[in-house]
Amino acid sequence: MAKTGAVLPARRNRVLLALTLALTVLAGASSSEAAPPSPPGPSKPAPATPPAASGASALQGIPGMDFSALSPSAQHELATVLSDEFCYCGCPHTLGQCLTGHTGCQHARRMTRLAARQAAAGVPATDIIVALSEYYASFRAPRQKLEVDPRMCMGDAKAPVTLVEFSDFECPYCGKARPVLEAFAKKNATKVRFCNVPYPLPMHPNALPAGQAALWARDQGKYWEMHDALFENAHRLSTATLVELANKIGLKGAELQKALQAGTYAQELEKYKSMGTRANIRGTPSLFFNGRFNDVQLGLTEEMLSHALEDETTWRANNNAWAAD
């Protein structure tokens, strides 16, 4: 360890001399002319015009349509859609051109309202364009043949549109969709026949016996009562709960337990699962309007369902084509 001691006289003199020379150099430097300041760097470019402004201006002047309620970012995304996407009626114009130059085209207005709802929900323009393209392409795609027991349907059997939902009783998204779909079906009972098909997913172990319980209740005349009870108890669908729910809706839980143990409805449920697989179901809930897959990425709201119903009705009324404006 180094120890602290007195500095020797000769060494002290050398230190003082070095300090004196250093101070002399510094004094000379301070007396010399200061170097000219560096030229200022290039000025920063002015901030780019916010996308919102260009979006808002692009949406102005469209006859009969007002998008001022949309946020600036949503207006920008919608403006991009209008400039990049073509009208689904088949005319050689973008949506924006069709709205301003072909004002009689009702298709462009409907398509724009659909895009505006997506933009308002925060969906970027690229995703909106993909969703719109897939939605309108679905009308020309081959329809799926879906055979559902009429006891699993509600509404007029002669309704022009049949809406089939494939759902999993443990699926949280299906649970959220249930009240929306049922309200829509009841509101449009003469226009829509709504059918539900159990489609248990592999990751939901209790969805399989729950689906069998629904089919069993159907044979007792209470499919929809069991359907609703299952969704309301989706977090606890053990066999004991299924028996409890059967008793609660006025059926004999002991009989349901026997049916589950015997696998009475396993084969029929497998048939519905196979039907969904053939229809290329990618998840639940999956909706089909007259056999046409209606992707829920556009939203599963009563407004969107009404939009799809109107489109399906228009398509059918024009012999499976879009009317030319």
Residue spans of the language-model regions?
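Signal peptide processing junction and immediate N-terminal pro/mature segment
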Residues: 28-44
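N-terminal "domain-start" segment that seeds a small globular fold
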Residues: 54-62, 137-154
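Structural alpha/beta surface segment adjacent to cysteine/selenocysteine redox centers
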Residues: 81, 88, 94-119, 169-170, ...
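C-terminal cap of thioredoxin/glutaredoxin-like
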Residues: 162-167, 173-186, 197, 243-325
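Immediate flanking context of iron-sulfur cluster ligation sites
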Residues: 72-88
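Bacterial N-terminal signal peptides
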Residues: 18-28
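Bacterial N-terminal signal peptides that target proteins for export
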Residues: 3-17
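A short beta-strand-turn-helix
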Residues: 74, 146-161, 186
